[in-house]
Amino acid sequence: EIQPIAAPILDDSHKLTPKSSIEFRRVGVPQAMYYRDLFAHRLGTTSASEHFVLLLDGRVAGVVGFGSAFSRTFQQRQDGRAYMTEMYGFTAPSERYPRLNRLLMMLICSQQMHALWRPRETPVQRYAGISTTCLCQHPELKINRGILKLVSRERQKNALWKLSYTAEWRKETFAEALQRWLKTHGSEKQSRLK
């Protein structure tokens, strides 16, 4: 049975600042699916086996899932390097911060996120960064520009595009990623609140 964790959801009354706390909390499938269903409206099952909620100032701002078995997530891409595979990532709906998903992507591409995976690495098996695959109606996802690199694009029979992206670990902490995001997406000008 799906269920929430003991934390409120980030809403438009809360303002993020450069001093806002950032935490990725590992959760079980019931908690992850609660937020995934809430934020993305029942997408069905997922093959992710590592699930995290993103907490900003103690409020649930997003949920993200990764493959966990090293053999499954250690995927060789066109450049011959291995990347941790993001299976899904969704954020709470926000009028104040319509680009909240960009923050989630920036955070999971940071070296601080890499630290969560480093204990699984070996001298011959190291993650170069994050990879993900998206299905969409357009040949590129604007939300990923400047964060992820488009490495392949394939038109599907159903007219959707299958897009594969990678990103190397960015040399920044969660706090530095938040500050960078706030400069471009955290201002009142970006807000849809009037």
Regions found by a protein language model. Name each.
Residues Y35-F39, L107, W181:
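Residues that form generic nucleotide/phosphate-binding pockets
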Residues E1, A32-M33, L163, R170-K194:
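Contiguous surface segments at macromolecular interaction interfaces
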Residues R26, A48, L56, G67-R180:
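Acyl-donor binding region in acyl/amide transferases
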Residues G62-V63:
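Short glycine-/small-residue motifs
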Residues I2-T46:
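Short amphipathic alpha-helix that is part of the acyltransferase structural core
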